[in-house]
Design a protein with these regions (language model features):
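N-terminal, polar/charged subdomain of small-to-medium soluble alpha/beta proteins
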Residues: 1-118
Length: 118
């Protein structure tokens, strides 16, 4: 199994349930792992592998669509990646909100969603 990683990507986006979050936006950190079986393909040609630039562009486009919950954002990214690459066996995505509007919090909050496919 081969896994492609995109780690600690940072986006400004307008996700959140509070009006200030959707209006002003926030910084988000995204990490993504995509695993697939590589044993039947040649790994010396970009058309035979999952291109991390394509994955980045999918994440970037989905992060630009405002949604109230990070769970919904993660699910939409996973659905799009799976639609583009049917041979994927596992996807895991972590989305962290870097400046959560919670009084007194100093740190990141977020979610991780992982899905396995047959």
């Amino acid at each position: 199994m081969l896994t492609v990683h995109l780690e600690d990507l940072v986006f400004h986006a307008h996700h959140g349930v509070y009006s200030g979050e959707s209006a002003v936006g926030n910084s988000f950190q995204v990490s993504l792992s995509v695993s697939y079986e590589e044993e039947k393909i040649k790994l010396n040609d970009l058309k035979n592998v999952i291109n991390y630039e394509d994955l980045f562009n999918i994440v970037k486009k989905r992060m630009a669509v405002p949604m109230p919950l990070l769970e919904e954002v993660a699910e939409s990214i996973i659905r799009k990646i799976r639609h583009e690459y049917a041979n994927i066996k596992k996807i895991s995505i972590t989305i962290l909100k870097l400046n959560a509007p919670i009084e007194g919090i100093h740190g990141k909050v977020g979610i991780t969603l992982s899905k396995k496919f047959d």
